[in-house]
């Protein structure tokens, strides 16, 4: 059974070996996320090499995502996890040290220290550990813990009511982007996006490195990102609803409503949407998710999210492969009761991004024709990825087989809802239609006498403008030997 909603897996110590990565791929991974808040270029480079070798060997559109560290406040390295209890105190310092309970822990960036005030609430590791500032000095802050937990290396830290304007991109981010371009990665997830200018500035950096069209995913995780959401969505290629930091920066009870708003608005704007953070969190330790987690994943799918993301579950959890299999099972079961027709009508009515009235008419009419004719799939040839991305926003019941000669587009489409990318060297319409039908049959999407709708481009036309309703049998009747001399 196919799954239209895509799965993103964060790669970490639990999964960064060839054997584990292949198991994740077999379980349903579509995108491998590398979190550049952790690790080095050397360690990420090893993982990237394994992923590239794996996707070539298996001939699959596995995308690789670079997630930037961004302008966040974060703890430094600790010698070993520091266990804390209510009432315990810990010193945070500006100088770089290997942290311990006795010597304290480094806090990055050092520019935040002058802005910290006593009695300010502190949340560590997405709010799992809570503390309060009891002593604030120029290069040192002392905090007192309000609950028990373990302080680990590089964990996120949030200080309430701190008014400091951090730069959107740090020197590390720029170096990481350069590395990502050199490694020919497929997607960039930009952390803590506040406005469309942040996206524009990142595009300029990517352009300076020779990759101006590298897709950028805007992570929405603070109040400015929410406030400026519409302009950010138009500037970015996709949206990630980063619920962890969002639930710290705003009230946690606001997150479900914001999730629904952003999923809907992303779709209407023609942008893919990723729902992230704590989706199957208990599976970091346990072999089964909670009922609430299953409902959380299902509701994200009902909201129309393009992809769901696993973080700690696959990066450092005890059951990474089973977590992916569980996620895929939830997707497949939920999609049985997904109201495709309602989404189709709603998206046409509320579409906020009219790419062109002509293309809108072709796409909308084509999906209607395909559904009324009981077609089993849509096949579309694309060089830029625009046509399948455009069709995906309507959330059609029909799988979209996207045929492309562009390797970057092939991998980039891995994150799009309902899109199944296929790489070809052919521009001959008869040949690529034949290849797409063979691909569909091999993947279990199509059978011999199924009807299909083919989107293609007429001679001299820039946009997709040709719709053909045919059958798999008619396309495959002449063999490739007969088609190609």
Swiss-Prot record:
Looking at the UniProt record for this protein, which Gene Ontology cellular component terms does it annotate, in alphabetical order?
cytoplasm; cytosol
Spell out the disulfide connections: none
Keywords from the named record: ATP-binding, Glycolysis, Kinase, Magnesium, Metal-binding, Nucleotide-binding, Potassium, Pyruvate, Transferase
Keyword Metal-binding part of the UniProt annotation:
yes
What cofactor(s) does the depicted protein rely on? Answer: Mg(2+); K(+)
Tell me the residue numbers annotated for binding K(+): 35, 37, 67-68
Q: Which residues bind substrate?
A: 33, 244-245, 277
Would the keyword Membrane be found if you checked this record's keyword annotation? no
Listed name of the protein: Pyruvate kinase
Q: Which organism is this protein's natural source?
A: Chlamydia trachomatis serovar D (strain ATCC VR-885 / DSM 19411 / UW-3/Cx)
Its taxonomic placement starts with: Bacteria, Pseudomonadati, Chlamydiota, Chlamydiia, Chlamydiales
Its gene? pyk
